């Protein structure tokens, strides 16, 4: 990775910032696309801003992409997206513009590259008759967010067939770790536990899997180095499911919280997926990927980080039925 020219869209976001910091540490020459220049105040990248090139561009606007059309990159990681599943029902146009049009624009008007890695989502699977979710499963997206992600994936595949350029689609499953938004389930549970705020959840019998962010970044980097690049979509996930009620209890315990746990206080959302976790055979066999940080160790690291910065987060009111 040393001295490679890398472009990261969404590089100031949660996963993107972890990827950017890792790339810088490996000696890559990293450019980061941000929507607004003011994002340089973002603490996620404060330690590496002097080592990255910042490009201000709104990927939904073709004109803003022309400024770096003549550049060339070894790898483009496309992570910029509208990322909240529940809110995508309230902001359909924004979700689709950010996840479909922005992706199409970047693929059509991007600078030259040797490899393009598109970040899709496990949400594209939607309702499935069996678990774990395999790459061979037919996607059945059930939210505007998931529809947008799958549409972006289809466009990327089309572009790959059209140009014969290596475009890889990766479907990471739920990811957590330091610097994550308080609107995600694990940070919300941690912050409420640390503040001893009552925690209300659904019955919590639905299952998810959660992957510590460093493990996901490992998978991204393996995809960037693999020769020849895989032609098929790849799941990145641990294949370990946990019930949401057990997740809440686990975090409550690890935080030593005095919060009141109100399991079952909230209804499930109408489009609830009852079981959702990765089939990771391809990641294990093709990439030789394995999670290096266990789920519990990842939780402990995350709790330690949020404990340091808990005072900087808002008091949360969003219900834990919006996974």
What does each model-identified segment do?
Residues 60, 90, 98, 136, ...:
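Residue-level signal for the nucleotide or nucleotide-sugar donor/cofactor binding architecture
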Residues 213, 267-290, 297-301:
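Conserved C-terminal active-site "lid" loop/helix of NAD(P)H-dependent oxidoreductases
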Residues 1-175, 309:
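N-terminal Rossmann-like NAD(P)+-binding domain of SDR-like oxidoreductases, especially those catalyzing
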Residues 2, 295-323:
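Amphipathic terminal alpha-helices
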Residues 19, 189, 220-224, 248-251, ...:
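Hydrophobic "lid"/C-terminal helical patch
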Residues 203, 231-234, 243-248, 256-275, ...:
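C-terminal "lid/loop" region of Rossmann-like NAD(P)-dependent oxidoreductases
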Residues 216, 220, 236, 247, ...:
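Non-catalytic, hydrophobic alpha-helical segments
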Residues 150, 166, 175-188, 195-197, ...:
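Glycine/proline-rich active-site loop of Rossmann-fold NAD(P)-dependent oxidoreductases
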């Amino acid at each position: 990775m040393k001295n490679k020219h890398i472009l990261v869209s969404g590089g100031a976001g949660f996963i993107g910032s972890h990827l950017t910091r890792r790339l810088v540490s490996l000696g890559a020459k990293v450019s980061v696309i941000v929507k607004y220049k003011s994002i340089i105040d973002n603490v996620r990248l404060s330690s590496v801003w002097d080592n990255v090139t910042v490009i201000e561009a709104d990927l939904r606007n073709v004109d803003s992409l022309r400024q770096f059309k003549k550049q060339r990159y070894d790898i483009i990681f496309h992570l910029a997206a509208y990322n909240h599943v529940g809110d995508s029902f309230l902001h359909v146009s924004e979700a689709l513009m950010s996840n479909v049009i922005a992706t199409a624009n970047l693929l059509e008007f991007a600078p030259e590259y040797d490899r393009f890695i598109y970040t899709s989502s496990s949400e594209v699977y939607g309702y499935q008759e069996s678990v774990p979710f395999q790459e061979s499963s037919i996607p059945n997206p059930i939210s505007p967010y998931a529809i947008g992600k799958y549409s972006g994936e289809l466009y990327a595949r089309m572009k790959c067939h059209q140009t014969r350029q290596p475009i890889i689609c990766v479907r990471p499953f739920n990811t957590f770790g330091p610097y994550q938004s308080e609107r995600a389930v694990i940070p919300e549970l941690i912050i409420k536990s640390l503040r001893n705020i009552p925690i209300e959840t659904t019955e919590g019998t639905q299952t998810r899997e959660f992957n510590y962010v460093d493990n996901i970044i490992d998978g991204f980097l393996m995809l960037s180095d693999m020769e020849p690049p895989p032609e098929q979509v790849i799941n990145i996930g641990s294949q370990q499911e946990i019930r949401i009620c057990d997740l809440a209890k686990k975090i409550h315990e690890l935080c030593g919280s005095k919060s009141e746990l109100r399991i079952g206080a909230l209804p499930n959302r109408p489009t609830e997926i009852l079981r959702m976790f990765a089939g990771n055979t391809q990641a294990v066999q093709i990439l030789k990927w394995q999670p290096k940080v266990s789920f519990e160790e990842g939780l402990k690291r995350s709790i330690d980080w949020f404990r340091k910065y808990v005072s900087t987060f808002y008091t949360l009111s969003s219900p834990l039925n919006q996974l």
